[in-house]
Amino acid sequence: MFDFSSVDLLDAFTRELRLCKVTEGEHVVVLSEPASRGDYVAAAFGAAKALGAHVIAATVPGGSPAPLPSTHTGAGPGLRSVLADTTAQDLLKSADLVVDLTQEGFIHAPVQQEILRAGTRILFVCDAPDVLVRNLPDEGDKQRVLRGVELLKSSRTMRVTSAVGTDLTVQLAGSRPEFQTGFADDPGRWDHWPSTMVLCWPELSDGRIVLAEGDILLPFKEYVQSPVTLHIAGGRIEKAEGGAEARLLETFFADADDEWGRHLSHMGWGLMRSADWFATAMYGKGDLMGMDARAFAGNFLWSTGPHPVLGRESYAHLDIAMRGCTVSVDGTEVVTGGELVER
């Protein structure tokens, strides 16, 4: 019996690599581990070849130094087999584009920054097939997120409020605004398919965050069942109050025994209008990274743990996606009551 599973993905991967500006004669490395999806490897390989690139499929041993299960959490440092192998690193540095199909990627690994400094573009892909296809980005998405980045760069404070009691003030000085747009088209750029979001890395934030029923805790991939109030001072979660999810978070911080586990890291808002908030409920936890929740248009996304701008390395990484918030940047609302505002 023939395996045709990659055929349906070939068109999507080809369109995606075009957005990544893969051209004839470029060198593309498709990076995988034994647990990676074979149909993704085949589709990425075929797409790169169809666009005239030189393509190599490189499979390295699995295994991560992260204490958490390294399966689509967004918290891992990458694979030991790459972190400890300069030959593998040199291969990635020599490529024009790396299509990273590993389970966890190298999002929080210093070696990724070395690869990017070599001019390599990196595209990380790991969500389920229909999630990728439904959220295939558009070239115009880049201008949308860049407008948000420019607003953050020119502003001093971001305020987040909600009807259930969130009231957080964020100092934007030195917060290094960034974006994800779902494709890696510039030399030295990392991006994630799918994703469309604006984010920054502030140091100081004060107030309270109130999680409402239906907000999403990642990487647990669980919906909040009862309200949780988080008291924030100087960018640190001082206390979590509420029901089962509050106890879950307090236990997570205690068990992590991590210096930076309670500290906030990146935060921002989603612009991916094709995202499905209910995807988290419809798939197995091992099938999703959870980008529908992270990049959902009009969400407020914030996180804990690793903070590269401040030099904080941490495995205690949470992403929490909230709906129903109003996000204003120096008085300009970019999200109103959970609805994305685009001018």
Q: Model segments located where?
A:
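Dual-mode signal for accessory low-complexity, basic/Gly-rich regions
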Residues: 223, 239-305
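Short conserved micro-motifs at the rims of enzyme active sites and ligand-binding pockets
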Residues: 221-222, 278-281, 312-315, 339
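Active-site bordering "gate/hinge" segments
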Residues: 1-225, 233, 258, 325-343
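Short N-terminal helix-initiation segments at or just after the protein's N-terminus
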Residues: 40, 100-103, 168-180, 208-210, ...
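Internal helix-turn-beta structural module
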Residues: 286-341
